Amino acid sequence: MSLVHMNVIVAFTLSLVGLLMYRSHLMSALLCMEGMMLSLFVLAALTILNSHFTLASMMPIILLVFAACEAAIGLALLVTISNTYGTDYVQNLNLLQC
């Protein structure tokens, strides 16, 4: 395994640890998930470039499109929650309350 692959895997792991540890604010959770998606994009692009598998060359672009959609929906939810509750604390968002 090359050094570039190891760096991408470390970036994914750090984003996952950040998501698990710092989940008090919605904005930090969204940033950690965006870091995970970008590291998956780089890993998929590197894997396809190293294996010369041209049929799967659209997969990183599709993954990037889904990451952009996820970011847009997450930011829309963040704006809605900030306007409704005044904060972006995740623990205040209990969906089971009426």
UniProtKB/Swiss-Prot annotation:
GO terms for biological process: ATP synthesis coupled electron transport. The chain crosses the membrane at residues 1-21, 29-49, 61-81. It is found in: Mitochondrion inner membrane. Keywords: Electron transport, Membrane, Mitochondrion, Mitochondrion inner membrane, NAD, Respiratory chain, Translocase, Transmembrane, Transmembrane helix, Transport, Ubiquinone. It holds the Pfam family Oxidored_q2. It is a multi-pass membrane protein. Its EC number is 7.1.1.2. The keyword Hydrolase does not apply. InterPro entries: NADH_UbQ_OxRdtase_chain4L/K, NUOK/Mnh_C1-like. It is an enzyme of class 7 (translocase). Belongs to the complex I subunit 4L family. This is NADH-ubiquinone oxidoreductase chain 4L. It comes from Ziphius cavirostris (Cuvier's beaked whale). The gene is MT-ND4L.
